[in-house]
Amino acid sequence: MNIQCLSFINCYTTCLLYTSRTDMRKSIDGLCAIIQEQFSMEIDHALFLFCGRKCDRIKAILKEPDGIVMIYKRLTAQGSYRWPRNKSEVRNLTWREFDWLMSGIDIEQPKAIKAT
């Protein structure tokens, strides 16, 4: 999954990452409940990313005009996502950080990568 594969997402203004471990058995309703009940946020106009105990799979939800979409990705190789686990929070990501995360790059790197 990279930003090119999900080109339809760029119309969403915000990419938000839930840093705490998520029970990956949760459905759309369960993931929406995390956002609405723990953080008093609505899911409109944002892509929300979730990761479980194993960092080899993620879920994402986003709201469209006619419903809510859930995307699930499990890495098939030995790789894993470098998911920030500071505390239970929703963290705002730039689209560049989203692309780094999907590419396996740590988004909490001490030095920024220079744009080419």
Give residue ranges: language-model regions.
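Conserved small/polar residues in nucleotide/adenosyl-binding loops
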Residues: 18-19
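Domain-level signal for Mg2+-assisted phosphodiester chemistry and nucleotide/NA-binding surfaces
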Residues: 22-23
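Mobile genetic element proteins and their domesticated derivatives, centered on retroelements
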Residues: 26, 60-61
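Conserved interaction-surface patches within small, structured recognition/assembly domains
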Residues: 41-55
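Compact nucleic-acid interaction/catalytic patches
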Residues: 61, 65-82
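C-terminal low-complexity, charged extensions that often adopt amphipathic alpha-helices
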Residues: 85-116
